[in-house]
């Protein structure tokens, strides 16, 4: 079965040492949690559109 978490990049937080994901340079290592979350941000905008339409009663 296809794992949905692998599609949206959440497993990068769990398997950040995997060879599939590149490591950040040392100067940017503190940004690693943000970079791991970045693939999910477009989905949040997609969900925000539904919340917005629910707030205006799907006019």
Curated annotation (Swiss-Prot):
GO cellular component entries: chloroplast thylakoid membrane; photosystem II reaction center
Membrane-spanning intervals of the chain: 30-50
Keywords: Chloroplast, Membrane, Photosynthesis, Photosystem II, Plastid, Reaction center, Thylakoid, Transmembrane, Transmembrane helix
Entry superkingdom: Eukaryota
Principal location: plastid
GO biological process: photosynthesis
Cellular compartments annotated: Plastid, Chloroplast thylakoid membrane
Record's keyword annotation contains Cell membrane: no
Residue ranges annotated as propeptide in the record: 1-22
Topology in the lipid bilayer: Single-pass membrane protein
InterPro entries from the UniProt entry: PSII_PsbK, PSII_PsbK_sf
Annotated S-S bridges: none
Coiled-coil residues: none
Pfam families: PsbK
Family designation: Belongs to the PsbK family.
Record note on quaternary structure: PSII is composed of 1 copy each of membrane proteins PsbA, PsbB, PsbC, PsbD, PsbE, PsbF, PsbH, PsbI, PsbJ, PsbK, PsbL, PsbM, PsbT, PsbX, PsbY, PsbZ, Psb30/Ycf12, at least 3 peripheral proteins of the oxygen-evolving complex and a large number of cofactors. It forms dimeric complexes.
Function as written in the Swiss-Prot or TrEMBL entry: One of the components of the core complex of photosystem II (PSII). PSII is a light-driven water:plastoquinone oxidoreductase that uses light energy to abstract electrons from H(2)O, generating O(2) and a proton gradient subsequently used for ATP formation. It consists of a core antenna complex that captures photons, and an electron transfer chain that converts photonic excitation into a charge separation.
Protein name per Swiss-Prot or TrEMBL: Photosystem II reaction center protein K
